[in-house]
From Swiss-Prot:
Residue stretches of biased makeup (Acidic residues): 680-718
Localization per Swiss-Prot or TrEMBL: Golgi apparatus; Cytoplasmic vesicle, Clathrin-coated vesicle membrane
Name of the encoding gene: apl6
An example Gene Ontology CC term for this record: clathrin-coated vesicle membrane
Region (Disordered): 674-745
Residues modified to Phosphoserine: S638
Reported function: Adaptins are components of the adaptor complexes which link clathrin to receptors in coated vesicles. Clathrin-associated protein complexes are believed to interact with the cytoplasmic tails of membrane proteins, leading to their selection and concentration. Beta adaptin is a subunit of the plasma membrane adaptor.
One matching Pfam family: Adaptin_N
Protein name: AP-3 complex subunit beta
Keyword flag Membrane: yes
PANTHER family, per database record: ADAPTOR COMPLEX SUBUNIT BETA FAMILY MEMBER (PTHR11134)
Keywords per UniProt: Cytoplasmic vesicle, Golgi apparatus, Membrane, Phosphoprotein, Protein transport, Transport
Membrane topology per record: Peripheral membrane protein
Length: 745
C-alpha cells in the first residue's frame, strides 16, 4: 500500500512539473507584446516594465527573430542602476553590437566603467561587449581593457579577455605583436578554463609561431585533464599540430617522453560523456600514438555506437576511414557492425561498408551469411544493393572464394529489385572478365531474355561481345533476341547491341577482303543490316554517327585496321571506384566528402633535423592551486597553503572552556546536571573577563590616538620610525568568540 502511494506521489509531481514547464514555455506567446508596447515599456520609469520588455526581446532572439529594430532604445539602458537590466542589455549588445557599431559607441563609456564592477560575471560580459563593437577608433581602448582583464583575479574574466583578443586582431592586425605578449601571459595561467581560450586565440592570431608554446607545453599537459569537455576539443587541435611539428615520430620500441606525457593526458578524453570529446581524443591518439597503443581508441568509439542516431552515423564515418587504413584494429569487433532494427538507412550503409573492408578469408564464415541475409531480407533496396557490392568486392579480392560468390551473383540477376540487379551485374562484369569461363557465359546468354534491368542487359551483352570467341555458336541467337526489343531499349543497351553486331559480322566475314552489305543474305549479315536500319531512324545522333562509322569499317572486314578497331577489347579490367579524398577523421569534410571552409589537414611528422631541442620545453610544470569555491587561483604573493593532516593540524583556541560545548539532550542524573551548571558558570566568568580585557584594550587604544593627535611633527616622524603596536595581536585572540550564555540566570 505504501509503495502505491509513493508512486502516486511521484506521478503527481511529474504532472505538476509538466504543467509548470508548459506554462513557462507559453508565457511569452500568451502575453504577446506589440511594437508600441515594447517601446513604451523600454522608455518607462519602471524597472519591472523594462525587464519585461528586454526579457521578451531576448526570448524572440532565441526564436530566431531579428530584434535589431529596438537597438537605440535598449542601448541607452546600459546605464541603468538595476544590475539585472544591465546584464540583459549586455547580452543584447553581444548579439547586435557588431551590426550597429555607431549606435554601440554610445555605450562604450558605461561598459568601460563596468570593468571595475565587483561581480566577475559583469566584468566578463563587459569585455565581451567592448570587443564586439566593430569600430577601429576604440580598438586602443579595447586593447587597454584586454591588458587589464588578463590579470583579473577571476578566471572567467581572463577567459573572456582571451577571446576578445581574436576580435581585436581581426579589426586591426597591426596590434599583433602586443597581442602575442598577452597570449603568452594567458598561456602561463593556472586556470583550466583560461588556457584553452588562449590556445584558441593562438590559432587565430599567430598559429605559425609554435615557439610560443614551448615553455608552457608541460603546464598545458598538466592542466589538460582538468579542462572541461568542450575546452579539450579546442586544445587538442593545437596540441596535435604542435606534436606533429616539434616532436619526433613515435616508434614501437620507444616514444619521446614529452609525447608520452601528452598521450597520458589525452586518455582522459575517453571517459568523457560528450561524444565530440571522445572523438577528438580518438583523433589525437590516432595521429600521435605508436601502433602498439592504437587499440585504445577502439572501445571508446564503439561505445558511441550506442548513442543517438546522428552521433552513431558520424562515428561510423570516422571508423570507416580508420578501417580503410588499419582494418586490424576492428577485426575482433565484427559483431558491433551487424545491422540492428533501429539503425537508420545511412547507418546501415556505413556498417555494410565497414564490414566489406573487414571481410577476409578468416572471418568470411561470420560476415558472408550476414550479407546474404541483408540481400534477401532487408526492406531497403539501397541497403541490399550495398550488400551485393560488398559481396562482389570480396569475390574480387579473394580468388579462392570467387566461385561461390559468382553463383550467388548470377542468381541475383533474376531479382525484381533493379538496384540489386545493377550491383550484381557490375560485380559480374569484373569477375567474369578477369576469369572468363564458358559455363558462366552460357548462363548469361540463356538468361538474357528474362532480364528486365537495362544495366544487367548491357553488362551481359558486353561480356558476350568481349569473349565472343568462347561461345561463337550462341552469339547469333543472343543478337537475334536482343534486336527484337531494340526500339524499346535504353541508349546504353543500344550501344552494346551495335557493338555485338559489328563484332559478329567482322568475325564471320574476316576472310573476305571486301563485300557489299546489302547483297549478303546470311543470318549474320541480315541481323547487322537490320540493326543499322533501326539506328538510322533513332533519335540519338551519337548512335547514328557511330553506326555510320562501323558500317564503313565493315565494308573491309579482313583489313588489319578494321580488326584492330572493332575486335580490340574496350573494357576496363578495374572496377569503377568513386574517388574520395583522404580527409582527416574528426572533420566535417570527411562527413560531407567535400572541402568545407576552414578544413586543415593534419601536418606530416617533421623531419628529425628540423626538430627543436628538448630544452626549449623546460618551463614551469607546477600549477598553482585553484580555490574550489570561487574558481580563482591563489595569488603567488599569498602565503603558501599547506595540506591539512593529523601531523600538522593544531587547534589553538586558548582556553578550551571558551568553546561552546553542545548541550546535552536527554535524561540526566542530578550529579550530571550540577556538573553542567558548574561548567556554564566557568564559561560565564571567562566571558566576563574577556569583555573586561577588551574594554581595557579599547581605552588604551583611544588614549594612544589622543597622544598621536597632540604630538608634534618630529614626534610623528619618530613614531613612524618605531611603528610599535600597543594592542594585542589578532593571532593571540581565540579563533572562535564565545557566545553569550542566555541560559545562565
Amino acid at each position: 500500500m505504501s509503495n502505491l502511494s509513493f508512486f502516486q506521489t511521484l506521478s503527481g509531481l511529474a504532472e505538476n512539473a509538466k504543467q509548470i514547464a508548459k506554462s513557462s514555455s507559453l508565457s511569452f506567446e500568451e502575453n504577446e507584446l506589440s511594437h508600441s508596447d515594447l517601446l513604451r515599456l523600454l522608455n518607462s520609469n519602471s524597472d519591472a516594465g523594462k525587464l519585461e520588455a528586454i526579457n521578451f526581446i531576448l526570448a524572440q532572439m532565441m526564436h530566431g527573430e531579428n530584434m535589431s529594430l529596438y537597438f537605440p532604445d535598449v542601448v541607452k539602458l546600459v546605464a541603468s542602476e538595476n544590475p539585472e537590466i544591465r546584464r540583459l542589455v549586455h547580452i543584447y549588445l553581444l548579439q547586435y553590437a557588431e551590426f550597429n557599431p555607431d549606435l554601440a559607441l554610445l555605450s562604450v563609456n558605461t561598459v568601460q566603467k563596468t570593468l571595475y564592477d565587483k561581480n566577475p560575471l559583469t566584468r566578463s560580459t563587459a569585455i565581451r561587449v567592448m570587443s564586439s563593437i566593430r569600430v577601429p577608433a576604440i580598438n586602443g581602448i579595447v586593447l587597454l581593457a584586454i591588458q587589464q582583464c588578463i590579470t583579473d583575479t577571476a578566471d572567467r574574466v581572463r577567459q573572456s579577455a582571451a577571446l576578445a583578443i581574436t576580435k581585436c586582431y581581426s579589426l586591426d592586425p597591426s596590434y599583433k605583436s602586443q597581442l602575442e605578449e598577452h597570449i603568452k601571459t594567458l598561456l602561463s595561467d593556472n586556470s583550466p578554463i583560461v588556457v584553452p581560450a588562449a590556445l584558441f586565440t593562438f590559432e587565430v592570431v599567430c598559429p605559425e609561431k609554435l615557439e610560443i608554446i614551448h615553455p608552457y607545453y608541460h603546464r598545458i599537459c598538466t592542466l589538460f585533464p582538468q579542462m572541461n569537455d568542450w575546452d579539450k576539443v579546442v586544445a587538442l587541435k593545437t596540441l596535435v599540430r604542435y606534436a606533429r611539428l616539434t616532436l619526433p615520430e613515435p616508434s614501437t620500441p620507444s616514444t619521446h617522453s614529452d609525447l608520452k606525457e601528452l598521450l597520458e593526458s589525452i586518455k582522459s578524453c575517453f571517459f568523457s560523456l560528450l561524444p565530440s570529446t571522445i572523438i577528438a581524443g580518438a583523433r589525437a591518439f590516432y595521429y600521435l600514438a605508436p601502433s602498439n597503443q592504437m587499440h585504445l581508441i577502439v572501445e571508446p568509439l564503439l561505445q558511441l555506437l550506442l548513442e543517438k542516431p546522428i552521433v552513431r552515423t558520424t562515428t561510423l564515418r570516422y571508423i570507416s576511414q580508420i578501417v580503410y587504413k588499419t582494418p586490424e584494429l576492428f577485426k575482433n569487433h565484427i559483431k558491433s557492425f551487424f545491422l540492428i532494427a533501429s539503425d537508420s538507412d545511412d547507418t546501415c550503409l556505413l556498417k555494410i561498408n565497414i564490414l566489406s573492408r573487414l571481410l577476409d578469408a578468416q572471418n568470411s564464415s561470420q560476415i558472408l551469411p550476414e550479407l546474404l541475409y541483408y540481400i534477401n531480407s532487408h526492406p531497403n533496396p539501397s541497403v541490399a544493393s550495398t550488400a551485393v557490392k560488398a559481396l562482389g568486392d570480396f569475390a574480387s579480392a579473394n580468388i579462392s572464394m570467387a566461385p561461390s560468390c559468382l553463383n550467388t551473383l548470377l542468381l541475383l540477376l533474376k531479382s525484381h529489385n533493379s538496384l540489386i540487379v545493377t550491383e550484381a551485374a557490375s560485380s559480374l562484369r569484373l569477375l567474369i572478365h578477369n576469369d572468363p569461363k564458358e559455363i558462366y557465359l552460357q548462363y548469361l546468354a540463356a538468361t538474357y531474355e528474362t532480364l528486365e534491368v537495362p544495366r544487367a542487359k548491357s553488362v551481359t551483352l558486353w561480356l558476350i561481345s568481349e569473349h565472343i570467341l568462347i561461345i561463337p555458336r550462341l552469339v547469333p541467337d543472343v543478337l537475334r533476341i536482343a534486336v527484337k526489343t531494340f526500339a524499346d531499349e535504353t541508349l546504353e543497351v543500344k550501344y552494346q547491341i551495335l557493338e555485338l553486331s559489328v563484332r559478329l559480322y567482322v568475325l564471320s566475314h574476316s576472310e573476305e577482303k571486301q563485300n557489299d552489305l546489302e547483297s549478303r543474305d546470311d543470318v549474320v549479315s541480315l541481323l547487322f543490316n537490320y540493326v543499322l536500319s533501326l539506328i538510322h531512324f533513332d533519335m540519338s545522333y551519337d548512335l547514328r554517327d557511330r553506326a555510320r562509322f562501323y558500317k564503313e569499317l565493315a565494308s573491309t572486314p579482313s583489313s588489319e585496321f578494321t580488326r584492330r578497331i572493332v575486335l580490340e577489347s574496350k573494357g576496363n579490367s578495374q572496377k569503377e571506384i568513386i574517388a574520395s579524398r583522404d580527409y582527416c577523421i574528426g572533420t566535417a569534410s570527411l562527413c560531407l566528402n567535400e572541402d568545407v571552409m576552414g578544413y586543415e589537414p593534419i601536418p606530416n611528422w617533421a623531419d628529425v633535423s628540423d626538430l627543436p631541442p628538448d630544452s626549449v620545453r623546460e618551463g614551469i610544470k607546477d600549477v598553482l592551486p585553484i580555490n574550489p569555491h570561487t574558481g580563482n587561483i591563489y595569488s603567488n604573493n599569498s602565503p603558501g597553503v599547506k595540506a591539512l593532516s593529523s601531523d600538522n593540524f593544531k587547534r589553538d583556541f586558548g582556553d578550551t572552556n571558551a568553546i561552546n560545548r553542545p548541550k546535552f539532550v536527554g535524561q540526566q542524573t542530578l550529579e550530571e546536571f550540577y556538573a553542567s551548571e558548574t561548567s556554564e558558570s566557568s564559561e560565564g566568568e571567562y566571558e566576563t573577563s574577556t569583555s573586561e580585557s577588551e574594554d581595557e584594550e579599547t581605552d588604551d587604544t583611544s588614549q594612544e590616538e589622543d597622544n598621536e593627535k597632540n604630538s608634534t611633527p618630529d614626534e610623528d616622524t619618530e613614531n613612524n620610525n618605531t611603528s610599535s603596536i600597543s594592542t594585542k595581536s589578532i593571532m593571540d585572540r581565540p579563533l572562535t568568540e564565545p557566545e553569550p550564555n542566555y541560559w545562565q540566570s
